[in-house]
């Protein structure tokens, strides 16, 4: 067992805060319309250029274990904000640093950390309620485009393309982002489907940064029953390996030995594979699998028709241009199904909707109809160089996530203004003691920091701008850092999704509370010895596969 380094009290927290400062200083430069890019060295290929806070945060690991513990805690605030709302990662980082630093000063001065936390929680809950009250639902294409533009660092084309994609497939529709093979940026609607089942093992992930499995031009095997043994599948698996194409398995379940064997072969590179459970339950599951079969020009392997896995040929497998699988969802893009067969299936479902008398059945049939006929909008991002394409693709993905958040919970005045004005009612909150009051004051001060940072990144004095805005009673009155003017932020189209602002604050407060209430820190002692490389097992069997 590795020896441990143990630190206590203010010394431990101070070192953690040093790590927090290092990460926050790297991330904060990206905030606002005049935020700067960060260049990140990659282990292979050209460096990555990004203005995405969470990408910067994820790239940072510090040599000092205690400082690194602080940096990793701060990173978790940015990561959580990205997972829940898709944006607001830099705001979460700036807020968390401010809350943690001020909180630690008061703990060092003798304040009770638990009461400080209670005061902070009271204040955060009050601000969340203010954000909900201030939020305004968005309906028009223009408002959707505004959110996309702001979240992509003022790129109007990105905002307009996202609005167009949402118009094509609906606000709840499936929209994916991929790299184009030319200079253009286009929206293309293709045959596709999304269902709410994710990968059965995280070992199927191919993109560890986004924690998704991406399969290009895969075969798709649809099996009605559970898979617990791969022996009957060996002929078809061998054929897939020889084709050098990936395989997606959709079955009632894949368990035990079958799942373990697929994972081993995926890790050893013998078989590019992912497995997901089939969507739905009972008869509806079978119907949805038949929908997928028609969409991908495959066959549902079902014992009702006397079909057996050992007799399945590669001709029975469906195909698609691309499949993306996250922890919760699977998206099939551009299935190779016959257009006429898909149209016939749509008509069949429509007739079932007309005939059914059950509201529940009707709702489920309409869901199937939407999945089969809605299609998938693909945002194809082009550019002059690989670095430019990747940087722009990151911004498109951020903007798309922020736009979805805006559709879900509405929008508020952007540019840090909503958080700044939400701090004013906090002075009226009732508390039990002075320590809780100090916790509220920590939040009041921290809520100024995102706006200050936006202004300072634009080259102005943040403190002066904050003071001027607090004198103004209009909650939408703010500072347009792009044009360096004081404006009504809503009328100027400078808006943020309410969900993004709310999530950033809640995640920041959660991390800061952990830091100020930490009294002891235990980390592995640094070792200069190189770890020996593990021996790799043989890759016997068919074509590098191990069954």
Swiss-Prot record:
BP-aspect Gene Ontology terms: protein refolding
SUPFAM superfamilies with a match to the protein in the record: GroEL apical domain-like, GroEL equatorial domain-like, GroEL-intermediate domain like
Cellular component annotations (GO), alphabetically ordered: cytoplasm
Main location as per UniProt: cytoplasm
List of residues binding ATP: 30-33, 51, 87-91, 415, 496
Subunit structure: Forms a cylinder of 14 subunits composed of two heptameric rings stacked back-to-back. Interacts with the co-chaperonin GroES.
Function (record text): Together with its co-chaperonin GroES, plays an essential role in assisting protein folding. The GroEL-GroES system forms a nano-cage that allows encapsulation of the non-native substrate proteins and provides a physical environment optimized to promote and accelerate protein folding.
Name assigned to this protein: Chaperonin GroEL
Organism: Rickettsia massiliae (strain Mtu5)
């Amino acid at each position: 067992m590795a020896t441990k380094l143990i630190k206590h009290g203010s010394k431990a927290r101070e070192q953690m805060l040093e790590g927090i400062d290092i990460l926050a200083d790297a991330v904060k430069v990206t905030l606002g319309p005049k935020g700067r890019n960060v260049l990140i060295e990659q282990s292979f290929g050209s460096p990555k250029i990004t203005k995405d806070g969470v990408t910067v945060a994820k790239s940072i690991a510090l040599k000092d274990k205690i400082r690194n513990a602080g940096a990793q805690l701060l990173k978790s605030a940015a990561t959580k904000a990205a997972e829940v709302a898709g944006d607001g990662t830099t705001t979460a980082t700036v807020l968390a640093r401010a809350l943690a630093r001020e909180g630690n000063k008061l703990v060092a001065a003798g304040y009770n950390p638990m009461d400080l936390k209670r005061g902070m929680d009271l204040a955060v809950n009050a601000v969340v309620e203010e954000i909900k009250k201030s939020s305004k639902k968005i309906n028009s294409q223009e408002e959707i485009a505004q959110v996309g533009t702001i979240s992509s660092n003022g790129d109007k084309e990105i905002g307009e393309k996202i609005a167009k994609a949402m118009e094509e497939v609906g606000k709840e529709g499936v929209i994916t982002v991929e790299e184009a093979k030319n200079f253009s940026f286009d929206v293309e609607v293709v045959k596709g489907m999304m269902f709410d089942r994710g990968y059965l093992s995280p070992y199927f992930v191919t993109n560890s940064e986004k924690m998704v499995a991406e399969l290009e031009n895969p075969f798709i095997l649809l099996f009605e029953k559970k898979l617990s043994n791969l022996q009957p599948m060996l002929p078809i698996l061998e054929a897939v390996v020889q084709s050098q194409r990936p395989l997606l398995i959709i079955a009632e379940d894949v368990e035990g030995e079958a799942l373990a064997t697929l994972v081993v072969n995926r890790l050893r590179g013998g078989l590019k594979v992912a497995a997901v459970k089939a969507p739905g339950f009972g008869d509806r599951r079978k119907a949805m699998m038949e929908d997928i079969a028609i969409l991908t020009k495959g066959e549902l392997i079902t014992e009702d028709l006397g079909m057996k896995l050992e007799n399945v040929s590669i001709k029975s497998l469906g195909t698609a241009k691309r499949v993306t699988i996250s922890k919760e969802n699977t998206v099939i893009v551009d299935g190779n199904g016959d257009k006429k067969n898909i149209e016939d299936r749509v008509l069949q479902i429509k007739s079932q909707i007309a005939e059914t008398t059950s509201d529940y059945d009707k709702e489920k049939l309409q869901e199937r109809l939407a999945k089969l006929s809605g299609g998938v909008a693909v945002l194809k991002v082009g550019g002059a160089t690989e670095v430019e394409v990747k940087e722009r693709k990151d911004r498109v993905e951020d903007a798309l996530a922020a736009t979805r958040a805006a559709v879900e919970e509405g929008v508020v005045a952007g540019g840090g203004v909503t958080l700044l004005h939400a701090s004013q009612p906090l002075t009226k909150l009732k508390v039990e003691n002075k320590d809780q009051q100090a916790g509220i004051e920590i939040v009041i001060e921290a809520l100024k920091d995102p706006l200050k940072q936006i202004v300072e990144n634009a080259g102005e004095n943040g403190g002066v701008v904050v003071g001027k805005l607090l004198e103004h009673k209009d909650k939408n009155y703010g500072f347009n850092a792009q044009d360096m003017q004081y404006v009504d932020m809503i009328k100027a189209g400078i808006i943020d999704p309410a969900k993004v602002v709310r999530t950033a604050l809640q995640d920041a407060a959660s991390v800061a509370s952990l830091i100020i209430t930490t009294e002891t820190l235990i980390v592995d002692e640094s070792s200069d010895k190189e770890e020996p490389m593990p021996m790799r097992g043989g890759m016997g069997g068919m074509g590098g596969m191990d069954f």
